[in-house]
């Protein structure tokens, strides 16, 4: 799949745009250190945007019927994404909890794969959090879903306010975890426990 996505971008157009950008900032794209930069940057963005055109829900290919009716939590799923406002990285960890319905569970790696697909595109952290939750709800129809994303945004670290180390935390709850504050708080305490 990686090869398919890398080949699906318009490589010539991307390289030409990067070449023009280098000229626009006063650089000489033909100097030794920059000769292959347009090609390298186009290839890098193709890899960083592997999630474009994919639905995170499609990552839930393994669904099992088990006798498990209690919460399932996978935390500290590392990810990186690209802020769609400034095209610089934001990165951090996603924590996912769901309460199975009728014993329907998924492979744990599928949760990480859904995060990967949703994050590898120009993105907003708020949307990323919701897309992960929605994919899980559509795939498993759990009684409750809660997703928490913690990230550092380079657009706040490198430019503007310049506050390195600051983190943004977003949460999205569905089902029981949206309806019941007590249930939601219990899951959040498990997610944030070291």
UniProtKB/Swiss-Prot annotation:
InterPro entries named in the record: GTP-CH-I_C/QueF (IPR043133), GTP-CH-I_N (IPR043134), GTP_CycHdrlase_I (IPR001474), GTP_CycHdrlase_I_CS (IPR018234), GTP_CycHdrlase_I_dom (IPR020602)
SS bonds (residue pairs): none
Pathway terms, separated by semicolons: Cofactor biosynthesis; 7,8-dihydroneopterin triphosphate biosynthesis; 7,8-dihydroneopterin triphosphate from GTP: step 1/1
EC number(s) from the headed UniProt entry: 3.5.4.16
This protein's UniProt keywords: GTP-binding, Hydrolase, Metal-binding, Nucleotide-binding, One-carbon metabolism, Zinc
GO BP terms in the entry: one-carbon metabolic process; tetrahydrobiopterin biosynthetic process; tetrahydrofolate biosynthetic process
Keyword hit for Metal-binding: yes
Record field: catalytic activity: GTP + H2O = 7,8-dihydroneopterin 3'-triphosphate + formate + H(+)
Transmembrane segments: none
Gene Ontology MF: a single term: GTP cyclohydrolase I activity
EC category: hydrolase
Similarity field: Belongs to the GTP cyclohydrolase I family.
Record note on quaternary structure: Toroid-shaped homodecamer, composed of two pentamers of five dimers.
NCBIfam families tied to this protein: folE, PRK09347.1-2, PRK09347.1-3
HAMAP family: FolE (MF_00223)
Protein name: GTP cyclohydrolase 1
Protein species of origin: Streptococcus pyogenes serotype M5 (strain Manfredo)
């Amino acid at each position: 799949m990686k090869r398919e996505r890398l080949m699906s971008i318009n490589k010539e157009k991307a390289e030409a745009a990067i070449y023009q950008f280098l000229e626009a900032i006063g650089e000489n794209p033909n100097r030794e250190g920059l000769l292959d930069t347009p090609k390298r940057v186009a290839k890098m963005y193709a890899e960083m945007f592997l999630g474009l055109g994919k639905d995170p829900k499609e990552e839930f290919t393994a669904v099992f019927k088990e006798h498990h009716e209690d919460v399932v939590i996978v935390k500290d799923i590392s990810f990186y994404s690209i802020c769609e406002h400034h095209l610089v990285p934001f990165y951090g960890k996603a924590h996912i909890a769901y309460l199975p319905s009728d014993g329907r569970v998924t492979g744990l790696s599928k949760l990480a794969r859904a995060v990967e697909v949703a994050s590898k595109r120009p993105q907003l952290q708020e949307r990323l959090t919701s897309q992960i939750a929605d994919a899980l709800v559509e795939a498993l129809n759990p009684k409750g879903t809660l997703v928490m994303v913690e990230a550092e945004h380079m657009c706040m670290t490198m430019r503007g306010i310049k506050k390195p180390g600051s983190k943004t935390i977003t949460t999205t709850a569905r089902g029981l975890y949206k309806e019941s504050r007590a249930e939601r708080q219990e899951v959040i305490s498990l997610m944030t426990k070291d």
